[in-house]
Amino acid sequence: TLKVRSWETDSNIPTPATAYVREVQDIQHAIDAVGGFPVIIKVTQGTQGHGVFLRHTLYEAQNLIQGLLMTGKSILVQQYVAESHGKDIRAFVVGYELVASMRRRARGREFRSNFHLNGTVEPVEIDDGFRRVALEAAKVMGLNIAGVDLLESHHGPLVLEVNSSPGLEGIERSTKVNVAAHIARFVMDAHAENNHLLSNQYTQERVLIANEDEKVSANSFE
């Protein structure tokens, strides 16, 4: 999984405020930088909702982060978006086209909405603003196939994560879209296009070689 990095300096993609913690001394500064408590604390290489925590006090945050740092984990602290608590949108991008989207909701007191954490899923039609942000996020990450997770904030879409190997079960079950077929079609089209380019390149090289051979042959009779 590729987690969202801090893009504020090199793109216009909206994300929750995020700060990295590399040592214990960074904790208070990171919390202040994202707007204070509550905060989301993440292990940067977690998947399917694992390694994501919600903390409400400095004591809780320090205990958690210190323990994670001791295990060599890379940690980030992220703004908590209250209006999106327990829900998000997964936009599935294939070949820079949005092929399906679903809303995920957490169950009970769980704040993580991941399907693999027993969250519920439902199809959702996202507007042009969400669509543009999802496509741009995949493009910036250089991914032809991506699951872009979006929060619905009062200020519009916020990119939470961009996943390079998104699961298909939840999105296909909720939307009834055959996402696997879209992926297969994209891969086959890309393969055909690559073969076409290679064929053209080979033909051009053969023409150049033939022309050079003719020049050599002509010069030999002068």
Model regions: which residues?
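Short acidic active-site motifs
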Residues: 26-30, 60
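A short beta-strand motif that forms the metal-chelation/ATP-contact edge
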Residues: 90-93, 156-170
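Conserved N-proximal alpha/beta basic substrate-recognition cap immediately N-terminal to
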Residues: 1-17, 29
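Phosphate-binding site of ATP-dependent enzymes
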Residues: 50-141
